[in-house]
Amino acid sequence: FRQIFPNLGWVEHNPEEIWKVTLRTIKEAIKKSKILKAKIISIGITNQRETTILWDKNTGKPVYNAIVWQDRRTNKICENLKKRKLENLFRNKTGLFIDPYFSATKVKWVLDNVSLSKKLIKNKRLMFGTIDTFLIWRLTDKTNHFTDATNASRTMMFNINSNQWDYEILKKLNIPKSIL
C-alpha cells in the first residue's frame, strides 16, 4: 500500500488499503499453502505498533487516515506536555519519552482536528487502535476490540507497571477511555 504525505513531516496510510492488502495476502497464503480454511485455528499479526487508526464502531469506516509512526505533526502537542512538566509522569508510567513517534499524541490530534471524531465520541461510537486492533476488529466481524501489551505499550497511554490503560494519562490528553 502507498504512503501518503499531505504535509511536510506527515505520513499517512489509507486504512482501507491496509485492509484490502491484508485480505488479499490471507487469500494468497491459503491458496499457496493448499490447506483447508477449516484447519486454520489461529493467525499471527505483525504490525507497525505506533501507527494509529480511529474509526466508527457502527460503520467500520475510519474517521481519518492511519497516522504512521514516522509522522511528526504532533511536535507542538509534545512540546506542550513537556512545558506542563509531564515528562516524568509519562516516563514512569509508560516507560516512554514524550514523542510524536507514539500513538497518544496522534489520537489527541485526530480528536482535536477531525470534527467527526467529536460526534462519534458523544454517541460512544469512536474506536481507537493500532493496526493490529483494527485488523482484529474487522477479521472478527466487529466483535473483538483488543490488542496485546506489546502493542499497547507503544501507545504512550498504557501503564507498564499495572499492565492496563492509564486513566491519568488519558485525562492529561483529553482522550476518553471509551475509545479504547
Where are these regions (language model features)?
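Metal-dependent DNA phosphodiester-chemistry modules and their immediately adjacent helices/loops
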Residues: 82-88
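Helix N-cap/coil-helix junction residues
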Residues: 35, 86, 174-175
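N-terminal glycine/serine-rich phosphate-binding loop of ATP-dependent small-molecule kinases
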Residues: 1-64, 76, 92
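Active-site catalytic microenvironments for nucleophilic, acid-base chemistry
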Residues: 28, 32, 80, 113, ...
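Carbohydrate-associated surface elements
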Residues: 71
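Conserved A3 ("GATE") glycine/threonine-rich loop of ANL adenylate-forming enzymes
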Residues: 51, 61, 74-76, 104-105, ...
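Gly/Ser/Thr-rich active-site cleft segment
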Residues: 90-180
